[in-house]
């Protein structure tokens, strides 16, 4: 149903939810685009902190700090995913070059890819167009959000929801992807989207009278399944 290999395990869970939903309705609203439109991902503000980290801490101490940070996470079954994410983040920060490029490189850094891919495969870098689009300018949260819109949102999440929902004859619509909303948030100052550590700040402020505070401040949970 995907017409090509699709390495997003959350497609399985999405299909189950779509199948259950179809038993009650024929059209459903999704939250797709909420993080890209309103700045809901941790990597957005972490990207801004990267410059401070690499300039304050001398380069010779980067590896020491990285090893110490990852050692704080024990490798128990329930912490293994967190340890992997921490290692990935620290490698991205510590790696020479573009931090955000390293974060979106599917879990592997350039030096790792060179070790296990033949040169012919490595030459065809699917993310090369990203560097060409953004260039070497200082990136803003809006730049990060636009990258995700073209890469993960259009190429993964929307494909996943469309294929799995239509397989159950359920029609899904994504109100957050209204063009006017996207254009509006692109014109806002960054602190309207990420205020300190508060992600999707303006969205929470707009609906705080309708939802309890604990609901608005719940931690993010992925939808992937163990594969």
Regions found by a protein language model. Name each.
Residues 1-124, 164-209:
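ATP-dependent adenylate-handling active sites, centered on carboxylate activation for C-N bond formation
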